[in-house]
Structures are given as C-alpha cells and as structure tokens.
Regions:
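Double-stranded RNA-binding/processing signature
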Residues: 1-295
Length: 295
C-alpha cells in the first residue's frame, strides 16, 4: 500500500489533503497530481472538475430564489464571485490544502487545484463524491447564510417532457420538475441554466474517458462543437421538444428546451441522473465515475 511508504513532508501533505477533501483518495496518481499541480493528468482533472463545480454552484444558487423570479442576475453574479480565481485561491488556503512545494504557484494555479480536486474525487469515487467535495470546499463555505428553497415547483404535469426524459433513460420521480420545464418563463430559464452546465459536464467526463491522450485545449475545442445550439437543437427535434412550429428554426430557443429537460432531470434525480440524460442527448459516453485514473 503506497500510503504506508509515506514519510516526512509528503506524509504531512497527504494528511492535509485528506482533511481538506474530507476523504482519502485511493489512487496514488491522483494524490501526486494534486500535490504537484502541473502536467497532463492535472490539466485533465481540472477540466472535469471545473465543469462539475459549475453544476454544484448553479444548482445551489438557483434554489436560493423563488422559481418565478424573472432575473438571473443574482445567480450569474454569485457564480462568478464563487468560482473566480481570487475566490478559489482563497478557498485553497482556508480549507487547508497543502502548500505546493515544487514551484511558486500562482493564484490561478491554486484555483485550478480546487477544480482538479473535484475532478479527482469524481475519478476516484464517482460523481456523488465530486459533489460532496465541491460542496465542502466551495458551496457550503461560500453560501452559508442563503436559504435553500428546494421545493418542487408547483407546475402541472407535462407528458412531453416526461416522455423525453424516459426516452433518455430517466425514471421520473417528481413530475413537477418537468412541468416547470414545459411551463416556460422563469422556471424554464432557471432549469435551463443548470441543464446547460450539466450538459457541459457530461461532455467533459465523456471526453476524459474516451480520449486519454487529449489535452485540455483539445477537449475544450471539441466540446464547443458538441455543445453548439444547432447540435443540441437537433436532438430537441428528435425528442419531440419543439412545441410550436414558429420556434422550429430558432436554435437558441429549441436548445433551451433540451437544457431545461436536463435541468429537470438533475433536480429530480441528482447529478448522476442529469449526466445520464445529457449523455443520451449528446450521444456520448455516460461517465458518472469512478474511472481509470489514467484514462
């Protein structure tokens, strides 16, 4: 067991890392990547963790306001405040992550390290573990006094959205989420902003698994194409999510339908459920983790 061979500063650093994350990472490679935050594996973990952190932050922020609140400015502003390099750099210090010994790490690199830690939790133990680390490091400390509404929106059921969710492999639990997506207006927009982040995370986790050699830059470029409004709108047509003929050619509007569907599934069944629906929408590998670290 690699832990038994640790001594001196490295043993202390690993102990600090465990305490900060609230868990032990089983993989030595993941631990080394977080202690010396540079190189191919670190970049790939940061890429995935960035996307997963966005889900955790946006989901929490959306729940702090009424579903009929028309403006998303609070959500947008608070998201930027929570995930900025400055904010995440402070998180690294306050949560007790060990110092970087190999080089003088910039604030940007320290912020990347928080995101990589979330990606490492996903690779090591799955998306639920990543959510827990994101909440422990960023969401709970950053939003300590904000209310969490959490209730299912009071919306009439909508079989169009429920059928689309089932077609994507999701077992609907609370129909109100899908009724809210169908209702349009602020409710749909709030679900869609979360759904957009989940779609991005589904693409990111799939890329990590499918292409072990791809760099962060290569994956980012590929993801932009997969996440285009035109590509997502095409799937909306296939899923029967274009309610009005006059909207059929409006890719932005049609893509919102799919994003709202994914957001509804995420609130209904959790992160893994949202990733599953997203993978079905995008036609990509469903990768809730854990995964081969070096994949």
């Amino acid at each position: 067991m690699w832990r038994e061979r640790l001594d001196g500063p490295t043993a202390l650093d690993v102990a600090h890392l465990n305490a900060a994350l609230g868990r032990q990472l089983a993989s030595h490679e993941l631990v080394l990547a977080l202690l010396d935050p540079r190189g191919h594996l670190f970049q790939r973990l940061e890429y995935v963790g960035d996307a997963l952190l966005d889900i955790a932050v946006l989901r929490a922020l959306v729940l702090t306001e009424p579903w009929d609140e028309p403006s998303l400015s609070f959500v947008s502003d608070e998201q930027q405040a929570l995930v900025s390099d400055h904010a995440l750099g402070r998180v690294a210090a306050r949560r007790g992550l060990p110092d970087v010994r190999a080089f003088d790490a910039s604030r940007h690199r320290l912020a990347d390290r928080i995101e990589a830690a979330i990606g490492a939790a996903w690779a090591d133990a799955g998306v639920d573990a990543a959510e827990q680390v994101a909440d422990r490091l960023v969401v709970a400390p950053g939003l300590p006094h904000l209310p969490r509404a959490g209730a299912v929106p009071d919306s009439a059921p909508d079989m169009r959205y429920e059928d689309a969710a089932r077609l994507c492999g999701h077992d609907v639990r609370a129909p109100g989420w899908f009724g809210a997506a169908a209702a349009g207006g602020p409710r749909r927009r709030r679900l869609a902003v979360v759904g957009d982040a989940v779609l991005e995370a589904a693409c990111s986790t799939s890329q990590y698994v499918d292409d072990p050699l791809a760099t962060e830059a290569q994956m980012s470029e590929e993801r932009r194409g997969a996440m285009s409004n035109a590509a997502i709108a095409g799937r909306a047509h296939e899923l029967g999510l274009v309610p009005r003929k006059e909207d059929a050619d409006d890719c932005r509007s049609v893509a919102d339908e799919v994003q709202a569907l994914v957001g509804a599934a995420t609130f209904d069944g959790g992160f893994a459920a949202g990733l599953g629906v997203s993978a079905a929408v995008l036609g990509c590998t469903y990768a809730p983790g854990p995964v081969d670290v070096l994949a």
